[in-house]
Amino acid sequence: MLWGPDNYLDIEDLRVPRITRTIEDGEDLVFGDHTVHVILAPGHTPGCLNYSFEVHDNGQAHRVIMVGGYGVFGPGIYPGKHEYPHSVTYAVDQALTFATSCVKTWEYCKENHCDVYLNPHPHLCAMLETDEKNKARKPGEENAFVIGLEGVRKWIVER
């Protein structure tokens, strides 16, 4: 993330990747036999994306929703002592956009029966704790990441 001439993490040799294509809302990205559905879901930045894909456990299919960029930034000082460059009005607009993204994501989850919630930030979905539960899993026990549609709704509401 760049803030004008500075960069968010104060990396001396920041190399910005070259954009080779853009991804559209609702696009399916195909990787061999695997398909990842893309959902535009503005949150802390306008380009935030959610992803959905199928996984299998013990021969049973499950639908994952991977939510990225949830939350909003308000005015203040952030890591690296950078001041957030926008006003309270911007933060309110951002919060309304974020709320719309939450509703859109939930509607997708209901329609597609998502039963696994992931987040690219492990602490925002108890990923490490859930993985520990799975390590102790006995044959025939449900995968701890499979939380059902209501469990997915809870994570979306709490984020």
Per-region residue spans from a language model:
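Active-site beta-strand termini and strand-to-loop segments that position acidic
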Residues: 31-32, 53-57
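Accessory terminal helices/loops
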Residues: 58, 73-159
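Active-site beta-strand-loop-beta-strand hairpin of nuclease catalytic cores
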Residues: 57-65
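Histidine-centered divalent metal-coordination motifs
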Residues: 44, 48, 121-123
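Extended hydrophobic secondary-structure segments that form protein cores and membrane-embedded regions
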Residues: 65-69, 117-118
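Metallo-beta-lactamase
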Residues: 1-40, 45-46, 68, 74, ...
